[in-house]
Design a protein with these regions (language model features):
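Helix-adjacent hinge/juxtasegments
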Residues: 44-84
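N-terminal beta1-alpha1 ligand-phosphate binding loop
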Residues: 1-17
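A short beta-strand-loop structural module common to alpha/beta enzyme folds
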Residues: 27-38
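C-terminal binding/interaction regions
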Residues: 5, 9-10, 88-144
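Patatin-like phospholipase
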Residues: 12-16, 23-26, 43, 47, ...
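A general structural signal for well-ordered alpha-helical segments in protein cores
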Residues: 14, 41, 45, 71, ...
Length: 144
């Protein structure tokens, strides 16, 4: 299960990604928002991040206009490594080297087709472990 959330600026892209993943047989749990009415991204980003951190969802996708605010929010939740990506290479490398468990995107930065490629790359790339695990452990130790 994939946690997904957005604010008003990311609502349309969130709905597009939900439909795209559903067509591929991937289930999403939507943590809001449910319209383009102005709202506060920390509310929705936090809810999705908590679902990933608790194990309720395997990974998460969060979207706002730039992706910046909602990624900062998600990264405040212990156990979350949320990467803001605007290209497939970043999505690949953050999974391979950082074991990112959440993806943030900016709806004003990436269009639907690019977002699909970024999401596919993020969800289908495995963590390499090895020397990268040591680095992820050092990051995680900072949360204590």
């Amino acid at each position: 299960m994939i946690a997904i959330a957005s604010d008003h600026g990311g609502y349309h892209l969130k709905e597009h990604i939900k439909a795209y993943l559903a067509a591929k047989g991937i289930t999403c749990q939507d943590f809001g928002t449910d319209s383009t009415e102005s709202c506060d991204y920390p509310v929705f980003g936090k809810a999705a991040a908590e679902a990933v951190a608790s194990g309720q969802c395997e990974k998460g996708i969060v979207i706002c206009t730039t992706g910046i605010g909602i990624s900062i929010t998600a990264n405040k939740v212990k156990g979350i490594r949320c990467a803001l990506c605007a290209d497939s290479l970043s999505a690949e490398m953050t999974r391979r080297h950082n074991n990112a468990n959440m993806l943030a995107m900016g709806a004003g930065i990436v269009g639907p087709n690019l977002a699909e490629r970024i999401v596919d790359t993020f969800l289908n790339t495995e963590f390499e472990g090895g020397r990268h695990q040591r680095r992820v452990d050092l990051i995680s130790a900072m949360e204590e």
